[in-house]
Amino acid sequence: MSNEAPEVEPHSKRRKKEASPSSSSGFLQSLPEAVAMICLARVSRLDHAALSLVSKSCRSMVLSPELYQTRSLIGYAEKFLYVCFCMPTDETLCCHEKINGNRSLNVLFLDCRSHKWHHVTSMRVARVSPEVSVVDGKINVWGGCKYKHYYDWGEVFDPKTQTWADMSIPKPVREEKIYVVDSWDVGSYYYLPSKSIWEKGNQDSKRSKDWCLIDKLIYSCGNDGGIYWCEAGELDWCDAVGIDWREVFGLEFLSKELRESRVVYFGGKMVKVWESYKIMYNISLNLEELLPETQLTNLTELGHNVLVFWEKLECCCDGFKILEIWCAEISLERWEGGEILGRCDWCHPILAINLLTVDPLFYHSMVLYSIPVDV
């Protein structure tokens, strides 16, 4: 008979056994379904993938629409930013271009809960790179088409009925305006849903590279890399008055990054070629002004903050080039004197692309769309 004391397992191993998936699953299964759903709803969405591996019942609850409804009802929905990048391959140089030479009627819908793409009802008019906005829960799409009639220029999608209609709204909803900035005509237009009419706004929109609206102020990125703002109502002013663009202070470091992002692809060779064309054909535009669609810079509204995207071309020690996509979150504070101060709350690269087999001059990345979603 042995007098040795029984071997005791280390504390860490006991903790692992106590927190095993089977015991966690059994605990949830012992609760009423509604209570278990509330417990899961309080868990961050970043942990849902791990939770779905615990058991079949946990996976079923994590994937159920009721979980996201519960998260919203009890105030635990989290805000995530979804960004659609143009990442051209050798076969597709730019996804803003036409598909096989044609505009497309197809529309894809991303379910932010399951991260799956679905086809929805096709548009009435084939388009490429249209502008999109949401008003009163309906998706307004306009531009990017060859149209014979004015009503072909824009159309509205109703997610509830899954149908498209022209942009003329028969009954007034509320006095909201949809602003459109034409980068070629260097001017603004706005659409009144309540009256189903278009009006010409101020044509002095020269600082327009990207736009977003926050707290009734319009923010835009200038060609010099600065971020500027104006009152929303100024887009309605007559041309003689002009738009009073004011710079957001405190973002000097960001201005340098955005300014360099404009010419990151051009290099000395391309600039020299273009300079010879300018002399030959008496052209006054610079190369970066001629190719605005190659720029990644994008402004996105995130609550009361603004997100800025830009690109950096880094050279590695082995001679290879890496394209980094950067993002910064800027908080905005309006002072008593009316000026606006910007502070960088967060700034990091979010994507790196190895340009081993791609000429950086012809690799044009851009942010197509970006939107914050509560999930």
UniProtKB/Swiss-Prot annotation:
SUPFAM superfamilies: Kelch motif (SSF117281). CDD domains: F-box_AtAFR-like. Residues 25-71 form the F-box domain. Kelch repeats lie at residues 138-183. Transmembrane segments: none annotated. Keywords: Kelch repeat. The keyword Heme does not apply. Pfam families: F-box, Kelch_FKB95. Residues 1-27 are annotated as: Disordered. The keyword Transferase does not apply. This is Putative F-box/kelch-repeat protein At3g24610.
